[in-house]
Regions:
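Hydrophobic alpha-helical transmembrane segments of multi-pass integral membrane proteins
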Residues: 1-164
Length: 164
């Protein structure tokens, strides 16, 4: 698992993220992919040291799944509306919010008396990221080009739907 985590991060490095500065949509997805590597490294650490088994779960679910799922959903909605994903201003900030939520959640495991404040900060960043994702999905849904049916494709009068 340690080798797999290192290979994921090495592969990400070979994609040259610094060359994609003009593509925030791709940078956001790369950030989510980086959380997969971090999660694998934390899993290897948990097998050797047993500090907090939940750290791996949080890296995968909050960091990787949050950034990748929101990024892919938004890219699909933008492309369906015939927009340009690289022009969407919130794709990278959303990935950064999910990353902030993951980092705060991981820090809460070792924070001592400040664990609750970090946990609330993580929950706030995570909720804000999903709220902004929903808002942008609605925005792009409204802009989706609706294909009109050709009058020849409309059902004829007297047509009844099959079923009960």
């Amino acid at each position: 698992v340690l080798v797999a985590g290192g290979l994921v991060l090495w592969r990400l490095w070979r994609w040259r993220p610094w060359a994609c500065r003009q593509r925030p949509d791709l940078l956001g997805l790369m950030l989510g992919y980086a959380w997969l590597g971090v999660g694998l490294l934390l899993l290897a650490r948990a097998w050797w040291q047993q500090p907090h088994a939940s750290a791996t779960l949080h890296a995968f679910t909050i960091g990787a799944l949050g950034a990748l799922a929101s990024g892919i959903m938004l890219r699909q909605a933008i492309l369906r509306a015939r927009g340009r994903p690289e022009a969407e201003p919130l794709l990278l900030p959303l990935a950064l919010l999910f990353s902030l939520a993951a980092v705060l959640r991981l820090l809460a495991l070792e924070a001592g008396q400040h664990w609750l404040a970090l946990l609330w900060g993580s929950a706030l960043a995570w909720s804000l990221a999903w709220g902004l994702t929903a808002w942008r999905l609605l925005h792009w849904r409204r802009r989706t080009v609706r294909r009109r049916l050709d009058p020849g494709q409309l059902p004829r009068e007297g047509y009844r739907r099959a079923g009960p």
